[in-house]
Amino acid sequence: MVNDFNEKNGIKKRLLDFFPVVLEGIREILESMQYFPEETEKLLYSIKRNTLGGKNNRGLAVLQSLTSLINRELEEAEFRDAALLGWLIEILQGCFLMADDIMDQSIKRRGLDCWYLVVGVRRAINESQLLEACIPLLIRKYFRNMPYYVDLLDTFREVTFLTELGQQEDLLSSRDGEASLRSFDLMKYDFIITYKTSFYSFYLPIKCALLLSRNSNQKAYDTTIKLSKLLGYYFQVQDDYLDCFGDYTVLGKVGMDIQDNKCTWLVCYAEKFASADQLNLLRAHYGKAGSENIAVIKQLYHELQIPELYHKFEDDMVDSISKEIDLIDESTGLKKCIFTKFFQLIYKRSR
């Protein structure tokens, strides 16, 4: 059996080597519109800067999932189609992150200054929209003659809407003031992470692979949604924990959730278990800028044993996800190994 680490890195190199093809496709679209050459280069640089630099897990997932579904190595045309869709998901991720950094007033992303700090808020907003808008044009350019073309367009549009709906609720729930803290609860949190994270991070790559493999089994799609929600929940709670207790040098970004008044797993449970005095402390310091406020909240989390609760949660989620993977009906064409690989990527991660 091929070593998973070497296999992943070999595929990753091929995926990265393919990215210029995607950029060239965008260039051809812009040239057909007679867009100005100098501005074309600026936009292509923005796309490159805001798409590259991550772990590429979503793009890799399309390639690895398709390989598992057809149970053989990908032919060149199959690799090309899967790599294209993988990069479209990475571009979608890039546009979400650009907007997210503006809304959260973040400083660093993937170890670099956030794009809005480089080019200004107005240009960064418009370029995030351009990243999103180029996706259906690239799908039309490369897949318009395929039988799954409409399904592909529909899937990207739906997932984009669901993700932005989750982002909207995340934004509204983190509005300034004590009232927002009182509105934090696990039901609201579940909604945010289901729509903000699960669909584009887990469901979309696998759905793309299912479409490429010509699998139209509804049960396979339903199972994919169910497991994607579980994986997304686990992934986002990890994100919340790492934002507070992770190592910046490993994460490549500065944690902002406490001062940004975010509805996180940590604050939901802190509210649930806090005494009256602790709740007053939480309301006095949560959502406030300044290292002293952040230190108070982190100390409160320790007093409430939130880190210990997180580690128990992680163990329970590992057990639940493992059991759900074992229940997958492979007669639908879906493969257990697809979700196992996803699970291995995020299992007790540190970034």
From Swiss-Prot:
Co-factor binding comment: Binds 2 Mg(2+) ions per subunit.
Known function: Catalyzes the trans-addition of the 3 molecules of IPP onto DMAPP to form geranylgeranyl pyrophosphate. Required for the membrane attachment of ypt7 and rhb1. May be involved in vesicle trafficking and protein sorting. Required for forespore membrane formation.
Annotated residues for binding of dimethylallyl diphosphate: 109, 196-197, 236, 253, 262
EC assignment: 2.5.1.-, 2.5.1.1, 2.5.1.29, 2.5.1.10
Domain of life: Eukaryota
Cellular location(s): Cytoplasm; Nucleus
Binding site for Mg(2+) 2: 100, 104
A cellular component term, taken from the record's GO annotations: cytoplasm
Subunit structure: Interacts with fps1.
Positions of Mg(2+) 1 binding: 100, 104
Gene: spo9
Residues that bind isopentenyl diphosphate: 55, 58, 93, 110
EC category name: transferase
Species name: Schizosaccharomyces pombe (strain 972 / ATCC 24843) (Fission yeast)
PANTHER family tied to this protein: FARNESYL PYROPHOSPHATE SYNTHASE, FARNESYL-PYROPHOSPHATE SYNTHETASE
UniProt xrefs under InterPro entries: FPS1-like, Isoprenoid_synthase_dom_sf, Polyprenyl_synt, Polyprenyl_synt_CS
Family stated for the protein in its record: Belongs to the FPP/GGPP synthase family.
Catalytic reaction list: isopentenyl diphosphate + dimethylallyl diphosphate = (2E)-geranyl diphosphate + diphosphate; isopentenyl diphosphate + (2E)-geranyl diphosphate = (2E,6E)-farnesyl diphosphate + diphosphate; isopentenyl diphosphate + (2E,6E)-farnesyl diphosphate = (2E,6E,10E)-geranylgeranyl diphosphate + diphosphate
Keyword annotations from UniProtKB, A to Z: Carotenoid biosynthesis, Cytoplasm, Isoprene biosynthesis, Magnesium, Metal-binding, Nucleus, Protein transport, Transferase, Transport
Cofactor needs: Mg(2+)
Pfam families xrefs: polyprenyl_synt (PF00348)
GO MF terms, alphabetically ordered: (2E,6E)-farnesyl diphosphate synthase activity; dimethylallyltranstransferase activity; geranylgeranyl diphosphate synthase activity; metal ion binding
Broad class of the protein's primary localization: cytoplasm
GO biological process: one example: geranylgeranyl diphosphate biosynthetic process
Protein name, UniProt field: Geranylgeranyl pyrophosphate synthase
